[in-house]
Amino acid sequence: MSTFTAACVQITSRTDVHDNLKVTTDLIRQAVDAGADFIATPEVTNLLEPNKAAAQEKAQLQDDDITLAAFREIAAETGKWLLAGSLVIKKPDDDRLTNRSFLIGPDGAIVAQYDKIHMFDVELQNGESHKESRAYAPGDKAVLADTVWGPFGLSICYDVRFSHLYQQLALAGARVMTVPAAFTETTGQAHWHILLRARAIENGAFVIAPAQCGQHSEKRRTYGHSLIIDPWGEILAEAGDEPGIILAEIDLDQVAKRRQQIPNLKNHRDFDLVVPDSIATAAE
C-alpha cells in the first residue's frame, strides 16, 4: 500500500482520566467515520496532571491502563491503526512515571511502544518553567515500527528539537515520523511549525503531529495546531486551537520522489570535529 488517510485527534486533556477517555474516543470514532486509516492522539492523552503526587496516584501500570485497553478495543473493532500518542504510565520499579507512545495494529495488538527520550526541562523568558524529569523517567531507545505502509519512526514532543533522532530513524528506513505533542503556547507560537517542517524536509518524510490544545490548568496552556506535513515541508492539514480532528491523504510515493530530488540522506557523511586547544581548554 502506498497511500492511506491519516488523522490527528486534538484534545484538551485534564486531570480526570475518564473524562479524557470519553472525549478522545468520541473524536477517534469521528475520524473513523471520516475515512481515516491511521489515527493519532497527542502526548499525555490520558492524563495531564500538574501535581506529581496526584499523577502518581492516578496513573496505572501498563497492563491496567484503561485508556490503552479502550484504544486496543477500538482498533480491533474498527480495523484501524491507532497511535496513542503518549500515555502516562506507572513504572513498577520506579517512583517516576513513563511518557510512553503505543502503536496499535488493526487487530488490537500493540505493535510497538516508545518511551520519550528527551525530557522537557526548560526555563522560558516569561518566567514559565517546566521540569519533566522530576516526574518522568526518560527512555533510552529510538523505535522504528513496522506497519502495513512501511516503517514509522516514533517520537514525542520535545524530541522534535533533536534532529539527529529523526535522521537516524530515516536512515533506518522511516518514511513517516509521528510527533504527538503538548507544546506550550509560548514555544508553540515561536517554534512548532518551523521544527516540524524542518524534520519533514531534512528527512524527506511525512510528519504526523497531533497536539494538545487550550487551558489544562491555571498554569498550563498548550498551543494546538496539529499538523500533517509532506516530505517537501508543505502543510497538508492543520488544526486550530480547539479540540477536533484533521485528516490528510498520505502518498508514500512522494517520499522516494523527494529523496531522489534532494538525496541528503544518501549524501550523509560522518566527520571528525577539529577543536583548537585554546577552545578545548576554555571549555574544561
Where do the model's predicted regions map?
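Active-site catalytic loop in hydrolytic enzyme cores
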Residues: 92-172, 185-194, 261-264
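A short C-terminal boundary segment appended to hydrolase-like catalytic domains
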Residues: 253-284
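Short, acidic/polar
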Residues: 19-29, 161-167
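Active-site-proximal beta-strand elements of phosphoester/diester hydrolases
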Residues: 3-15, 40, 100, 113, ...
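Cys-nucleophile CN-hydrolase/nitrilase-fold catalytic domain and related Cys-dependent amidase chemistry
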Residues: 17, 25-107, 113, 183-199
